Design a protein with these regions (language model features):
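ABC-family P-loop ATPase nucleotide-binding domains
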Residues: 10-15, 67, 72-166
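A short, flexible loop at the N-terminus of ABC-type nucleotide-binding domains that lies
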Residues: 1-4, 9-30, 35, 58
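Short, glycine/charged-rich "phosphate-handling" switch motifs in NTP-dependent
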Residues: 193
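Conserved catalytic loops of ABC-family nucleotide-binding domains
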Residues: 170-179
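Conserved helical "switch/dimer-interface" subregion of ABC/ABC-like ATPase nucleotide-binding domains
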Residues: 163-171, 186
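Conserved H-loop
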Residues: 73, 182-190
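ABC ATPase nucleotide-binding domain signature region
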Residues: 30-35, 39-93
Length: 194
């Protein structure tokens, strides 16, 4: 379970504090995949960053004993001067994957992303779609109790989207999804609750 306890997040503006959340309390139960929908600026992505530990609340806390992914598809954490292979190696070291486990994850991302020779070129030479494929594949290469997906289904062409959705469905057999999407079809196909 993930519990949000009195979660408060604000950002400074010229007119004072803009509160995204104020004393938000909510529980994401285990074994349930949840879809989050809302208008632009409602705080969905901010919530995902807080749950994933990429940002800290101004007050309150996120409580869990479960493993939680970073927001799937987030490519801003990748190093542009490194190749995709080197970025995968780096993340593997952070998560304790070495030896054959590391090689397995590298193969998974390389095969999943389908970017050919670019896999061994610096990410700064990639299109945004190619970076998204690497980031998405890297996120799926690791096992988590909860996967955070912030508009993750928007990555790539229809064939790649179908492939991504198949991996999501496979992951939900052993893990939970918290999915932010404007696509009601993705929410219906992948989530138990909205």
């Amino acid at each position: 379970m993930i519990e949000l306890v009195n979660l408060t997040k604000w950002f400074p503006t010229p007119g004072g504090r803009h509160y995204v959340f104020r004393n938000l309390n909510f529980s994401f139960p285990d074994r349930v995949s949840i879809g989050l929908m809302g208008r632009n600026g409602a705080g969905k992505s901010t919530l995902m960053r807080l749950i994933g530990g990429l940002d800290t609340p101004d007050e309150g806390e996120v409580r869990t004993n479960n493993s939680i992914s970073w927001p799937v598809g987030l490519s801003s954490g990748l190093q542009g001067s490194l190749t995709a292979r080197d970025n995968v190696r780096f993340v593997c070291r952070l998560y304790g994957a070495t030896g054959e486990a590391m090689q397995e994850k590298i193969r998974f991302v390389q095969e999943f992303a389908e970017i050919g020779k670019f896999f061994d070129m610096p990410l700064k030479t990639y299109s945004s779609g190619m970076r998204g494929r690497i980031s998405f594949g890297l996120s799926m290469a690791f096992s988590f109790d909860y996967y955070l997906i912030d508009e993750g289904m928007a990555t790539g062409d229809p064939i790649f989207r179908k492939k991504a959705q198949a991996v999501f469905k496979e992951r939900t057999q052993d893990a939970n999804l918290i999915l932010v999407s404007h696509n009601t079809r993705d929410i219906q196909d992948l989530c138990d609750m909205v």
